[in-house]
């Protein structure tokens, strides 16, 4: 089924599923997926997971074709233990598995970490865990990023709060 203005095809619904635009009939170019939903962000670690009580775990996503946009807020009411780099697990889709093609995004807000607060989000190809990156010194312009570790988690109530968003391509 096609949709036209005057004599020009603007959109087509393919028999096998998906939409094409502006006269394109190739299935490979069809937009074949559009969805939105929720996901549950959870603090984890690359070496051993900390013991965490989450007070806020909100995650939303929109997926159009292979493009995914996620947003989230995660906050703890208690945290202890664990080891290694602190990550946020539970992404709804893994980024495309292309070597050296990382997804990254800003952190809109972070608070109540013990020493350094995370400033950037980083996701490795084909991974569903978001790394929390901070500057490597107290200089806010220091470009050398270092992962937040489980030792940065505060055990205070309403602590370790992160609000962020991330866009990436998935398979």
Q: What are the roles of these predicted feature ranges?
A:
Residues 54-118, 163-170:
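Beta-rich globular "head" domains
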Residues 18-23, 165-171:
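Enriched but not universal
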Residues 113-154:
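Structured beta-strand segments within beta-sheet-rich domains
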Residues 13, 63, 123-125:
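Generic beta-strand structural signal
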Residues 21-65:
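Terminal (often C-terminal
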Residues 5, 82-94, 139-167:
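Extended Gly/Ser/Thr-rich low-complexity repeat segments
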Residues 1-33, 47, 80-82, 98, ...:
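Trimeric beta-solenoid/beta-helix "fiber body" segments of extracellular/virion adhesins
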């Amino acid at each position: 089924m096609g949709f036209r203005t005057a004599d020009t095809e603007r959109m087509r619904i393919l028999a096998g599923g998906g939409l094409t635009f502006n006269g394109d009939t190739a299935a490979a170019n069809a937009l074949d997926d559009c969805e939105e939903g929720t996901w549950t962000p959870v603090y984890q670690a690359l070496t051993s997971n900390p013991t965490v009580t989450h007070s806020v775990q909100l995650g939303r996503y929109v997926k159009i074709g292979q493009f995914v946009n996620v947003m989230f807020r995660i906050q703890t009411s208690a945290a202890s233990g664990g080891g290694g780099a602190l990550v946020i697990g539970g992404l709804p889709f893994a980024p495309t598995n292309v070597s050296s093609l990382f997804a990254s995004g800003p952190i809109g807000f972070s608070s109540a970490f013990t020493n350094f607060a995370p400033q950037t989000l980083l996701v490795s190809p084909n991974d569903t865990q978001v790394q929390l990156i901070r500057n490597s010194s107290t200089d806010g312009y220091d470009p050398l990023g270092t992962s937040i570790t489980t030792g940065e988690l505060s055990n205070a109530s309403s602590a370790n709060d992160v609000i962020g968003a991330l866009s990436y391509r998935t398979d």
